[in-house]
Design a protein with these regions (language model features):
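Rossmann-like dinucleotide/flavin-binding elements
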Residues: 212-243, 285-300, 308-317, 334-377
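Flavin-dependent oxidoreductase catalytic cores
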Residues: 1-221, 225, 229, 233-236, ...
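N-terminal Rossmann-like NAD(P) cofactor-binding module of classical short-chain dehydrogenase/reductase
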Residues: 305
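Short glycine-enriched, charge-decorated loop/helix-capping segments at active-site entrances
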Residues: 25, 99-103, 258-263, 321-322
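Short hydrophobic/charged patches on amphipathic alpha-helices used for structural packing
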Residues: 75, 133-137, 274, 293-297, ...
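N-terminal Rossmann-like dinucleotide/flavin-binding domain of flavoprotein oxidoreductases
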Residues: 254-301
């Protein structure tokens, strides 16, 4: 029974949305009345031996909304018929806590499950950016929760549990909590879910990996995440595959952007792909190598994949396109500047940096540059 996340029961529980003046509004007991009636009726219908799970937003993380203490108080009115509390958080107005943003720590909600468990002695489930098996094990071992819930992690890798039980953790294709293909598609624009790290999600017939029955050579130019995924897929279906990357390291922009403090989680994706590639004997990787026509021809390719990466979006400022990232210039893209700072970490001290754009990327730049002594505006 979903009693959180701004769904109907949650709207009755929350003082932000429940403005009623009858027996269903006002006090905590009144606001919990609908939840109590629904749960009692479900119990009557299913009998005493059928487990009832109730999901709650233990903290709404909105000014004037229910806090964890409020939640612990209103649960008394309907906890008796509940077998397991599924302890979540957030409302539609605090979506970053409802559908965990990637900057929130792994397993960050577990303290709320612990509080509910300690107050009522009921088994509790926790979830929220639990991507690493050890995090899940630690939560269970400490007794903070009794069950681990996972949604996006199983979209990214439906075999997560099997890989933990039988395989290597490095084989897990971990969710990076970007919320683009899953929540962004389904909730944001009402499209079928996809997944940034798993192209087979809703890929249908186009992504069935069928072994080839004749020799085939594939050349992939670019060793970022797209190039690595293409190269691994080609090798896994039986192609002799060559991947050419001009830089010394694989991973592309994902590996680079993971240098930003709140984007460290992004490194999991290229790391997974590099591990996957390392196990394929018919995949040959050339790093620190320029892809020339002569080299490509020598590989006798049947298929060539151009995965040389994307370019940053630039605002329509006169002269910007012609002058950005020029040698000795003062206008730089985020990727070029991060590369520069990683190579020369002291170079920003005392310098004035103007960031154009206050969206997620602009804020990432501020977070990356300010601690390095730059005067950022």
């Amino acid at each position: 029974i979903h009693a959180g996340h701004s769904y109907l029961i949650s709207q009755f529980l929350s003082p932000l949305t429940n403005k009623r003046t009858d027996e269903f509004g006002g006090s905590l007991e009144n606001r919990a009345r609908l939840a109590k009636l629904v749960i009692e009726e479900v119990r009557r219908q299913v009998g005493p031996f059928f487990p009832i799970f109730v999901r709650i937003s233990a903290d709404e993380f909105m000014e004037g909304g229910n806090t964890l203490d409020d939640c612990l108080d209103y649960l008394q009115y309907f906890q008796e018929e509940v077998d397991v509390f599924d302890v979540s958080a957030g409302l539609n107005g605090s979506i970053q806590y409802q559908i965990d943003a990637n900057y929130l720590p792994d397993g960050w909600r577990s303290y709320m499950a612990k509080a509910v468990k300690e107050r009522y002695g009921k088994p509790c489930m926790t979830m929220g950016n639990i991507r690493n098996p050890q995090v899940a094990e630690d939560i269970l071992a400490k007794g903070d929760a009794d069950l681990i819930g996972m949604g996006r992690g199983l979209i990214a890798d439906p075999e997560w549990v099997n890989k933990v039980e039988f395989g290597d953790e490095c084989d897990i294709r971990k969710c990076i909590s970007c919320n683009i293909g899953c929540a962004g598609n389904r909730i944001g624009i009402n499209r079928p879910i996809r997944c940034t790290v798993n192209p087979s999600v809703n890929g249908g017939e186009d992504y069935k990996k069928q072994k080839i029955n004749k020799p085939c050579n594939v050349v992939v130019i670019g060793g970022g995440t797209a190039g690595l995924e293409a190269a691994c897929t080609a090798a896994e279906v039986g192609c002799t595959t060559f991947l050419i990357e001009k830089k010394p390291e694989l991973g592309g922009l994902a590996a680079l952007i993971s240098k930003i403090p709140d984007k460290k989680r992004l490194a999991d994706f290229p790391n997974y792909l590099i591990h996957r590639a390392s196990k394929l004997k018919n995949l040959f990787i050339f790093k620190n190598t320029e892809a020339t026509i002569e080299m490509i021809r020598s590989m006798n390719p049947n298929i060539i994949v151009n995965a040389t990466g994307s370019n940053p979006l630039l605002p329509p400022i006169k002269g910007l396109h012609e002058n950005i990232d020029k040698e000795g210039g003062k206008v730089s893209s985020i990727t070029n500047m991060i590369n520069h700072v990683m190579e020369y970490p002291e170079d920003l001290k005392g310098k004035k940096v103007v960031v154009i754009g206050g969206g997620a990327v602009g804020l990432d730049v501020v977070e990356f540059f300010a601690p390095r002594g730059a005067d950022v505006s």
